[in-house]
Amino acid sequence: MITDRQLSILNAIVEDYVDFGQPVGSKTLIERHNLNVSPATIRNEMKQLEDLNYIEKTHSSSGRSPSQLGFRYYVNRLLEQTSHQKTNKLRRLNQLLVENQYDVSSALTYFADELSNISQYTTLVVHPNHKQDIINNVHLIRANPNLVIMVIVFSSGHVEHVHLASDIPFSNDKLNTISNFVTNKLTEFNQNLQDDIVSFVQSEQEEIFINKLLNTMNNHISNQSNSIYMGGKVKLIDALNESNVSSIQPILQYIESNRIAELLQDISSPNINVKIGNEIDDSLSDISIVTSQYHFDETLKGQIAVIGPTAMHYQNVIQLLNRIW
């Protein structure tokens, strides 16, 4: 446990280090912050914080920078403070959904970009799990002789568009008939479905097409539940270029791999969570990930992650995610 004065000094060191990217000395703290103590007292308190491993000295500077433990202590205090704050939730995601004709993928693509522009960090948004939603309707639209567009409408009002290759030039009337059949049978996906298909179809081609349609739809819903939309990838590269070029490759490999997807999908709490450096992975000492949940409605939800250097503007990011609905 540290004293209130040590906490004030630690907060000042973290905030200056994040703002300016340089180790912080006692003289700088006095010039920038109203600490109301002598330089000797600040140096003594900084020595205490260093002994407690909250700050560390670099060989090239007389100043101190926050350690991972120091960032952790600072972030924990922020999370405690914001957990008691009531905020007005932004409904921007629902606005994007309407603007994109309820196409979830398009809305989330814009959402990831907007979050990145606001936060100035790289963002990831995980597609919601439609396996927990109910399909209300399936519409089939012929785009050209070899392509049918399947429009899946969920009970939540969200829409997915799936391209379905077809060598069979079914008429629009036939596609409407197949659409109605599939929609009516959506609640009957059991061992009798294949018998129903055989009874319904008028040709082997129709049977092949309907089975392909059902398999494509199931695969799409399963794959979409694992889709991740990235905004502002270059922002992370730029931030890391300023600190440690050698760290960029393993970090990019991590965020583009299944490991980041697994990390985000493991989020079950609606609360904001922050992982710093080696808390994420042993090879990732230079980045932090701030995660939260977003909601389209009470049942359909997904995960958000903001990724940046360990010297991140945590307060801004936490406040932003705390306002997302």
Curated annotation (Swiss-Prot):
Disulfides per UniProt: none
GO biological process, one term: negative regulation of DNA-templated transcription
UniProt keyword terms in alphabetical order: Repressor, Stress response, Transcription, Transcription regulation
Molecular function GO terms recorded: DNA binding
Family: Belongs to the HrcA family.
Summary of the function given for this chain in its UniProt record: Negative regulator of class I heat shock genes (grpE-dnaK-dnaJ and groELS operons). Prevents heat-shock induction of these operons.
Protein name per the record: Heat-inducible transcription repressor HrcA
Organism name: Staphylococcus aureus (strain MRSA252)
Top-level taxonomy: Bacteria, Bacillati, Bacillota, Bacilli, Bacillales
